[in-house]
């Protein structure tokens, strides 16, 4: 007679299938199977959430257990962040470098025009420097010629003045006129020149020229100053005596 277990189920025969090693009976639920089914359901939910996040935002969600993108079978260093970004497109630095290269690259016509422009400017600078040197040399030469002409003109003027002086002192009354013309000399004054001229006239006087010599010493230019004395009558008397001297 088969023995009954404490739960009322008949115990198996020796060597037969065991009923208590995790295999559920016909009417009972296995706890281990239920736990495994629950874990599989949670894992499937997590995978579905990641798939929806990729479709919505375009970026993969965090990997479970710290696994890198691409799964545990991905090679180390191949699926890192930077390389993974380059697999989808160029990085920001690469895009900036390529943009600078495109900006720096210019058409052949523009490059040729720039070279011709530089050559033309260099030629203009060289021509300007050459003209400046020529102008300086020409200016120095003209200045030297001007100084030579001035010196020549000065020598001619001195020679003409000597000739004029010799001709002047050969004429009559040259000494008297010379005294009068030299009144601005610091050694002579107007009174001294007039006195010397009067003495010379007395020494060489001739009868009937006294009033003429007196009139020569007078200033007959009218004065317009109010403070000057009225000598118009005296002036008229001297002029009349000069023109018609008294007969002794």
From Swiss-Prot:
Compartments in which it is found: Cytoplasmic vesicle membrane; Membrane, Coated pit; Cytoplasm, Cytoskeleton, Spindle
Residues with the Phosphoserine modification: 105, 206, 236
Bilayer topology: Peripheral membrane protein
Name of the protein in its database record: Clathrin light chain A
MF GO annotations: clathrin heavy chain binding; GTPase binding; peptide binding; protein-containing complex binding; structural molecule activity
Organism: Homo sapiens (Human)
GO biological process, one term: cell division
Keyword set includes Cell membrane: no
